[in-house]
Amino acid sequence: QDVKEDLHSLLDSVEIIWSEAGLPLPDNFGWQIVSNVPMGQGLKSSSAISCAAIKALNIATWTGLNESEIIDLSVSSQRHAGCTVTGSMDDSWASISPGWKLVDPSQPAKYSILIEGEIKEDYCVFIILRGTRSNEINSQKFNDQLTIFERSLSSLSNGSVFHAMSANGMAVAAATDDDEALRICNNVIANGALSAAITGSGPAISVVCFKQDKALIEEVLSRTQYEIIESSFQESDLAEMIK
């Protein structure tokens, strides 16, 4: 079954990895992707799709996989599909569970979480959509920004999640020669945003602010002429929200 939104044939890879793990597939089933998350902009749509598909198979076949097992299958599926270099374990955790996590992708998901914490829901989140990724990702350029990435890690270790996000985004912008992203992020932070950063490897940008600053930040973002999505942090488990 072809799913037009599945550009990397990720769902085929999910089925292959699921079967290779010795898990049963339903006799008759099909896929449909229902999502407002744009693809190819650093918003982790591949991790979300793979986790959702594996959770759906888990429910349909009464397999009883836990979160860590679902994450491991998601990582393997994304690698098999070729839509990630690292396996995107961090992104898979973000897709399936609330809060934030610092993970070691070299470890199985069960042992991968190094630090984790919660983010309160009383913030506004904006996503600036700047089209699909056009720049090639050069791993050496990312290595050149090691000092800034280390600053991000230090902030996270000290509990400064938003500072960590901004520093990480600054490093990614420098590594991808994205001067526009740096200008946008610096501008919204100067106008009161708590954080502004490229998401993933870009080019989308996330902005976090207090709810009382929402109108001002919206006005600043409107000047960019890009499409803006408003979102929020969710500390509730997805299953609880569905109920």
Regions found by a protein language model. Give the residues of each.
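ATP-binding N-lobe of GHMP and related small-molecule kinases
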Residues: 1-41, 220, 232-243
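Short glycine/serine- and small hydrophobic-enriched flexible loop segments
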Residues: 15-19, 52-60, 154, 170
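Short, hydrophobic/aliphatic alpha-helical segments
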Residues: 25-37, 72-81, 181-192
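Short coil/turn connectors at secondary-structure junctions
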Residues: 26-29, 89-90, 97-98, 121-124, ...
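Alpha/beta catalytic cores of group-transfer enzymes, especially the acyltransferase/condensing modules
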Residues: 68-113
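C-terminal nucleotide
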Residues: 111-243
